[in-house]
């Protein structure tokens, strides 16, 4: 096995029944080693007809209830989630030669949670949430710049920019979490946790 992956998944299979503990361990290591955006993940969604789409978003929180990101609710992903709450996340940390895939169901976070995170953002980011009609077509770039200036004039007090109703967070409650380690000669290691109907986690090693 690659030296960077000294924590073998076979040992995790024997010792760890909680996938969140393993996620936390890997995520903390990624924050120390990944050069750019260790919280970046590929988010896969689909329409109610099953047409898929994927994009990069940033993880902004997690606990045993799920994994949280924020977005414009009227964006393409927002509209797809409203139609079909089933989604998947994939973290890939090249510096560690590790990957985590998460499958689950999305639900909107509470308003108070969204408000608290929104208020922690930089002023320009909060203004951007008002100005950008995410995923809609622009006549030109100037249209967006004018919208930014409009909302800067409207909300000149940087400490008093309310959260737009069209902007909030989504929480992915996982039903499966798979951990992947790079191995020599493509003999990778895979460990998958699945949530049972009794709300308990089972685990199994998978062939690469």
Pin down the residues of each PLM region.
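Binding-site signature for planar aromatic cofactors or substrates
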Residues: 1-208
């Amino acid at each position: 096995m690659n030296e960077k992956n000294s924590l073998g998944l076979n040992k995790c299979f024997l010792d760890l029944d909680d996938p969140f503990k393993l996620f936390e361990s890997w995520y903390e290591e990624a924050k120390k080693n990944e050069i750019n955006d260790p919280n970046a993940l590929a988010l896969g969604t689909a329409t109610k007809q099953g047409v898929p789409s994927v994009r990069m978003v940033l993880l902004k929180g997690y606990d045993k209830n799920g994994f949280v990101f924020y977005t414009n609710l009227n964006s393409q992903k927002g509209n797809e989630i409203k139609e079909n709450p089933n989604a998947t996340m994939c973290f890939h940390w090249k510096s560690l030669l590790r990957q985590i895939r998460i499958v689950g169901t999305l639900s909107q976070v509470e308003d108070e949670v969204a408000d608290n995170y929104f208020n922690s953002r930089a002023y320009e980011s909060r203004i951007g949430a008002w100005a950008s009609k995410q995923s809609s077509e622009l006549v030109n770039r100037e249209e967006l710049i004018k919208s930014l200036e409009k909302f800067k004039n409207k909300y000149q007090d940087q400490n008093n920019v309310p959260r737009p109703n069209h902007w909030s967070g989504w929480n992915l409650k996982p039903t499966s979490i798979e951990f992947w380690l790079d191995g020599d000669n493509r003999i990778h290691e895979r460990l998958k946790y699945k949530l049972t109907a009794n709300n308990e986690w089972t685990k199994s090693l998978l062939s690469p």
